[in-house]
């Protein structure tokens, strides 16, 4: 005995019909072809759909069918009746034009922020609904406030692509174990799918960072296995990655080409060029650095199509302090940038940012400012390289005027 496993895509049309009489199913579309099965009068068969046209597979008056036991062959089209479309094509409603996604981050232990106003220039939002746990479970933080958030977003025409993050887990070994086998990946995928269905959203943004370089291919396999499940839901899959060249666990843990080929969008996390571990002061996201990396993404190094790449940009900067040979910095939100009196702001044409530097009590202070001008220049890169869109990290760090630039 041979056991057959039948797999149908939930995103494809599914058609059934009934046999008008007891008859044979033929191997080929011909009366002289051998009989491979018998069906009875009134028995239901599914009509095989052509992969390209998504219409009934017909040949010279014959139609291709599948029995309930999984046998596929041909019967005369005139010998079946009561054709019915059980499930039509599931089409995903795509964003018209460029993606403009706003991340709305909040701790998994805090309620989802309340939003009431329409945000100009945004067509997708990514609240922090999902946090990865060490055993492959997902900590879901939605609640009543999250449900209201989804309603607010949809009422304003925004797609909702919540983020799944491993920020709080921050455990490379745990992520490695999750990616190690088909069974562990499938467990995580099932949890993701169920969480998305329960949340009633439009897609997901996968933001898994700080992984082992050795797990690069397994992570790609995870996304490859996840993608059809997301598409079967009629949803969008968005995957975040860092700049192409860097450390093993920050940059070299991603196969960007494979991820871009598999997902709907690949997000370049276009910030943290300099961070709290940097040994020299510098911008968080310089124009020159972003352009250099965009060229790597689109060029032969990564080979990614421009219509797959989203450039994410920061609504924050850093204030640097240099004293006694030591360098420290702190994050300053765009809306909280304050320029001391009597300090001259200059233009840095390399980073395309306003910049100031001054000395006080033996300490040198430096800041590359993120403002409407710097964001405007970064948006120029999106248009210049015909990227899929832009992303903004994150809501409530910005000045109100920046949304007019985004718009």
Regions found by a protein language model. Give the residues of each.
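SH3/SH3-like beta-barrel superfamily modules
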Residues: 1-3, 38-78
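Boundary regions of SH3-family modules and the immediately adjacent low-complexity/disordered segments
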Residues: 1-16, 66-99
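Hydrophobic faces of well-ordered beta-strands that scaffold small-molecule active sites
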Residues: 100-104, 123-127, 160-164, 204-206, ...
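Glycan-recognition patch characteristic of GH18 chitinases/ENGases
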Residues: 84-191
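Active-site groove signature of glycoside hydrolases
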Residues: 126-129, 187-218, 265-278, 391
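Glycan-binding loop/region signatures in secreted carbohydrate-active enzymes
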Residues: 308, 313-380
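Substrate-binding surface in catalytic domains of secreted glycosidases
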Residues: 134-144, 190, 213-340
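Short, acidic/polar
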Residues: 104-120, 180-197, 248-257, 370-383
